[in-house]
Curated annotation (Swiss-Prot):
Subunit and partners: Homodimer.
Disruption phenotype: Larval lethal and displays miRNA processing defects. Embryos do not develop past the first instar larvae stage. Most females contain ovaries with empty germaria accompanied by one or two terminal stage egg chambers. Accumulates pre-miRNAs and displays a reduction in mature miRNAs.
Protein name as catalogued: Protein Loquacious
InterPro entries associated with the record: dsRBD_dom, RLC_Component
Chief location of this protein within or outside the cell: cytoplasm
Locations listed in the record: Cytoplasm; Cytoplasm, Cytosol
UniProt free text on domains: RNA-binding DRBM domains 1 and 2 bind dsRNA while DRBM 3 binds Dcr-1. The RNA-binding DRBM 1 and 2 domains are able to bind dsRNA independently. The DRBM domains appears to bind to the RNA duplex and then slide along the siRNA helix to the ends of the siRNA. The DRBMs display a preference for binding to the more thermodynamically stable ends of the siRNA which is enhanced by interaction with Dcr-2. This suggests that the domains may also function to pre-orientate the guide strand prior to loading into the (AGO2)-containing RNA-induced silencing complex (siRISC).
SUPFAM superfamilies: dsRNA-binding domain-like
Region annotation Important for homodimerization and interaction with Dcr-1: where it falls in the sequence: 1-392
Region of interest (Sufficent for binding to Dcr-1), ranges: 392-463
Gene it is expressed from: loqs
Amino acid sequence: MDQENFHGSSLPQQLQNLHIQPQQASPNPVQTGFAPRRHYNNLVGLGNGNAVSGSPVKGAPLGQRHVKLKKEKISAQVAQLSQPGQLQLSDVGDPALAGGSGLQGGVGLMGVILPSDEALKFVSETDANGLAMKTPVSILQELLSRRGITPGYELVQIEGAIHEPTFRFRVSFKDKDTPFTAMGAGRSKKEAKHAAARALIDKLIGAQLPESPSSSAGPSVTGLTVAGSGGDGNANATGGGDASDKTVGNPIGWLQEMCMQRRWPPPSYETETEVGLPHERLFTIACSILNYREMGKGKSKKIAKRLAAHRMWMRLQETPIDSGKISDSICGELEGEPRSSENYYGELKDISVPTLTTQHSNKVSQFHKTLKNATGKKLLKLQKTCLKNNKIDYIKLLGEIATENQFEVTYVDIEEKTFSGQFQCLVQLSTLPVGVCHGSGPTAADAQRHAAQNALEYLKIMTKK
């Protein structure tokens, strides 16, 4: 079959204008039971999203099959050609740009119009509409894979109503024995994962990612803690009325939990203003905890309260805890006035303390005399020991002195932590009278060690001659 009659009289002239050599179309045998094979000329095939070749796409030999692309991708690629520095259509048939083969040898449209590296980058980073396909999860995976680290995702909690659940995910990894953890929440598991990954990326690179379409449906509550900092996360919310409807999760419950963990008074809510027409009311509610105060506005009291709690929760996450100020604030909260030594300890005058009897006084005096006259080697060595040296095993030394002087040592861990979040411990010496010393530390073991150190200081003072 003559090529001019098959493709039309204008095809060779069009191919010549594009510097593309015409190809001889080989007829294909008709197969029974299959639709007739379609033949496209190069220009029509290019416009319809088919491979650019004189050979048929479907059923072609393996060496002559071509990549079939969507119209959107072809349009995006053709648009790139019009930019300065890009490959022009007049260069399509250049063998140097097409790998020395022009349109022959089974080279698809992507390989002809774009160099192979640019084609791979285009396909991997864009979709059919030319939009970025990278999500926070994929970006985090790419960042950590360079260091041979794979982040792990864990479903922590599902909260909210059955028809509107809120999923909370934790993403974590270890780098040189340093744990990194981030929390994220969303209306779907996918959204929660992306929120957690976004929070971790924000911390790692110190920059905010652009909002993705999946997270635009509502702000995602995310939080990040590094090496057990104890933070529960942060959230994105605005102070407007409608925007507050998109607040994810239960900020009122989170704030209540935070106050319980820190042993603070519970938050109090108070309606400040109520303005607007009856059908368009705008409420303002204040949330107060100790000396902190945050406001929330919304079209209903519920929305305003949630926003106020959310802002307070966010503020407390970012505010360092000052144990001294917190203690003064709590005392002022409980007593209704700022703490002062006279007011705070004034009630001690009214407390009835049992009177020291002569018999009990003699026992205490006898105990002190016995301690001072003790001749144990460990107890005598204690007088010459500097107890500020951290290399000393205080618990072991106290046990040796107790064995030598025949009294028992009992450690009592206190469940309640200090205002600064430290563990507490009491050590009891079964002497007469009973000696009790207190200790605190970042861990329960450190608290016991500190209590033993204070007990040794007590014995050192009582046995000084």
